[in-house]
Amino acid sequence: MKRAFSTIYICLLAFLGLQAAQVDTLLVHSESMNKDIKVLAIRPDKALKGEQCPVIYLLHGCTDNHEKWLKVRPDLPEIADREGIIFVCPDGGYDSWYWDSPIVKEYCYETFISKELIAYTDANLSSIPDRSKRAITGLSMGGHGAMWNAIRNQDAFGAVGSTSGGLDIRPFPNNWGMKKYIGERDENLYVWNNHTVINQLDRLKDGALAIIIDCGISDFFYGVNKAVHERLLQLKVGHDFIARPGGHNDTYWNNSIDYQIKFFKKYFEKE
C-alpha cells in the first residue's frame, strides 16, 4: 500500500548528537476512492529507530496539496525531532473540503482521513495507535476538514485544531468548489446545513476533544471562527480560542502552527 518515490534526509545537530528526521512522499491506497493518495510523512529520529511516537495530521487548504505545510514551515523536520512527533500531511484532492461527498461518490475524504490513513500510519510509520496520541489540524479548508473529521470521528482523534478555518461554509456558496460536492446552496440548504462544522458542534461534550482554534482578525473567515467560539461557549465545551493580528496567508500560518503544536504536545504529555 506504500511506495516511496522521494526521500529527503534532514540532518540536524542537536544537544545529544546528530539526528536525522526523515521526510517521505508516499502513495497510500484508498479503498473507498479506489485510488492512491499522495501523503507527505515526517518521522523523527526516534520513530526511525523503532520508538512509537504521537502523530499530528496536517491538512492543507483549497488549491494546495500535501506539500503545503512543509512550504509554510520548512523546519517541520527539526520540530519533529525536537518534539518527538510524527507529522502526516495528506493530499486533500485540491478542493475536497475533506467530506464524503453525497454527490461525487468517488470523493470519500472523510473516510480516507479518519479511517484509511490512520490505519496506514499506525501500521507503517511507528505512530502510537491510540486516539490520546493523535491530533489533527489544518489551515483554511484544512481547518474545516480537521474539525469536521475530529468531531465526527471522536474515536479516532483526541485533539483537534483549526487555523484560519472555514468553519461555517454557508456564507460562501460560490467559493472554493464546494457546490461541486454538496450542490448549490439555495437548492440544497439541508445538505449545506449538515456539511458545515458549526452545525456539528452539538456532537461535542466538554472534554471529549482537546480543541484549539485561531484566526487572524483581518481574515475573511474571522467572523465564522468567532461564531464557532461563541457557540462552543454556549455549549460549555472547553476550548482555546486565539484571535490576533493577521490575515489569510503563509505568514500567519507560519506563526500560528507553533501555538497549535505546543497545545498538542501538552495534550499528548498529560495522558
Predicted regions: what is each one?
Residues 1-6:
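Positively charged n-region of N-terminal signal peptides that target proteins for export
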Residues 21-271:
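Non-catalytic cap/lid and distal C-terminal segments of serine-dependent acyl enzymes
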Residues 7-17:
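Bacterial N-terminal signal peptides
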